[in-house]
């Protein structure tokens, strides 16, 4: 847990970035007294070498993300993630991703394989890690900060939880020796800031929503980044909320 202090103002900003044909990325900031105190990234995409998430980060004057989540290994959520790892993460960055199934990446795209290779090299290095790399399943607390007014007038929790992927489905698949890739592994996030809650649903699909326990989705949601680009494969989410 980290402590963040402010004197006059505390703001939360979220930028949901969509590209013309495909690809999405999300950037969020905690802003204290008009200065960014915390920067988070969910997924990456770029076109013609231009990454809008990186532009937003650098515009704030910060060089690194505090929090990065790679929700799942599809190109429309991945292109540019290798550059994020190499240039915009440091030893204090909390890097979260979907669970590893195996080290065999043959069935993935070239971009995903390259990103995996970078992650494996960081994990296997005997030297100090470049960043903390963790995998997420439902009901993980991924981050917690206490934002306190130095005048004592207010104290607010900032927390990030994962509600997906489903440990129930992944455990059953592992026991059966079944390997499924893609959206089944997608990380879904809940961000709480004070009394507000934001859902970033990645590409979580119906199969996962069907088995999630109620307490994983018990928060009143103020903002939803809908799952899987609004596809019918994720249409039961409103029924679960």
Residue locations for each model-derived region?
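Metal-dependent catalytic neighborhoods of phosphoester/phosphodiester hydrolases
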Residues: 78-90, 106-117, 236-239
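Core dinuclear metal-dependent hydrolase active-site scaffold
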Residues: 1-64, 135-223, 231
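A short helix->loop->beta-strand "cap" motif at the edges of active sites that frequently abuts
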Residues: 38, 88-95, 128-131
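Metallo-beta-lactamase
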Residues: 65-76, 224-228
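Long, structured stretches of catalytic cores involved in phosphate-ester chemistry, encompassing
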Residues: 102, 218-241
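Short, conserved loop/helix-junction motifs that constitute active-site signature segments
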Residues: 61, 86-91, 216-220, 240-241
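Acidic, metal-coordinating catalytic cores used for nucleic-acid/nucleotide bond scission
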Residues: 45, 73-79, 229-235
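Short internal beta-strands
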Residues: 66, 93-103
């Amino acid at each position: 847990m980290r402590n963040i202090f402010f004197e006059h103002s505390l703001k939360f900003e979220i930028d949901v970035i969509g590209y013309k044909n495909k690809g999405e990325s999300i950037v969020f900031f905690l802003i204290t007294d008009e200065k960014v105190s915390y920067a988070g990234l969910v997924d990456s995409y770029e076109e013609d070498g231009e990454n809008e998430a990186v532009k937003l980060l650098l515009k704030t004057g910060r060089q690194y993300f505090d929090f990065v989540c790679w929700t799942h290994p599809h190109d429309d959520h991945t292109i540019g993630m290798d550059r994020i790892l190499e240039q915009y993460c440091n030893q204090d960055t909390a890097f979260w991703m979907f669970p590893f199934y195996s080290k065999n990446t043959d069935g993935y795209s070239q971009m995903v394989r390259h990103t995996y290779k970078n992650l494996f090299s960081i994990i296997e290095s005997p030297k100090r890690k470049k960043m903390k790399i963790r995998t997420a399943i439902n009901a993980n607390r991924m981050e917690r900060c206490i934002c306190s007014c130095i005048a004592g007038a207010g104290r607010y929790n900032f927390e990030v939880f994962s509600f997906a992927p489903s440990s129930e489905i992944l455990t059953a698949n592992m026991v059966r020796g079944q390997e499924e890739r893609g959206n089944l592994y997608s990380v879904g996030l809940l961000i709480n800031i004070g009394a507000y809650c934001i859902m970033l649903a990645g590409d979580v699909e119906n199969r996962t929503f069907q088995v999630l326990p109620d307490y994983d989705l018990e928060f009143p949601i103020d903002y939803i980044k809908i799952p899987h680009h609004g596809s019918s494969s994720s249409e039961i989410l409103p029924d679960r909320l």
